[in-house]
Amino acid sequence: VTNKRALVTGGSGAIGSVLAERLASDGCAVIVHAHRHVASAEQVVEKIRAGGGTASSVSFDLTDGMETRSALESLLKDGPIQIITHNAGIHDDAPMAGMTSEQWTNVIALSLNGFFNVTQPLLLPMIGTRWGRIVSISSLAGVTGNRGQANYAAAKAGLHGASKSLAIELASRGITVNVVAPGLIESPATRASFKPEQIEGLVPMRRVGTPEEVSALVSFLVSEQAGYITGQVIGINGGMA
């Protein structure tokens, strides 16, 4: 993947920042996306550059189709983006009986509508190169469901269906489309939500995964060696499912 342009949405977060650094170390020219956390994205870019990698940042609201398209059109002036990693997403948990329409809509707008808003404008330039990799970071909740996360699980399950369909559409063009569905991964939010003894009870491996482990899987999926893998939802969850 040397010198290929890679866009990482949500590139300032716990997984996104490590993923951006991994793709840069693989030789990609990484574009780190953020919306509200622009300063954090810039820090990721600076770290990549300090290590000898190539990186830049971009800021736009994934839920705004017109704003997203405008930002992507500017990026495409420098050539096609052949690797897309969708990592942006939010939680807004509540039992459905107490969930507001805003909670339902906002989570789906970012995780699912954002996938369309980013991917669609980049497809024709990618198809023109006859090589591409699209990987979305989903969640175990999208596979199994989870209490209090009907909105989040619906968004991620929708991402699975969209990715499987897109994989079929693009298979003859040298473009693969896959999903990585992590379980519990080390992050400030995970530490705040789960005590160590809870993790030992939930996860057969008795630990959380790391962003580096998720990034290693994505690194493989965007590589030449993974060219025959497409339309798959791949779990990375320590045996939880």
Say what each PLM segment does.
Residues 124, 168-169, 227:
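Alpha-helical segment proximal to the catalytic Tyr-Lys
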Residues 171, 176, 229-231:
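Short, small/polar-rich loop/turn modules that mediate ligand/substrate recognition or access, typified
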Residues 119, 155, 163:
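Active-site helix of classical SDR
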Residues 12-13:
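Conserved glycine-rich cofactor-binding loop
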Residues 139:
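Residue(s) in the substrate-gating loop at a strand-loop-helix junction
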Residues 95-96, 103-108, 199:
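Substrate-binding pocket helix/loop in short-chain dehydrogenase/reductase
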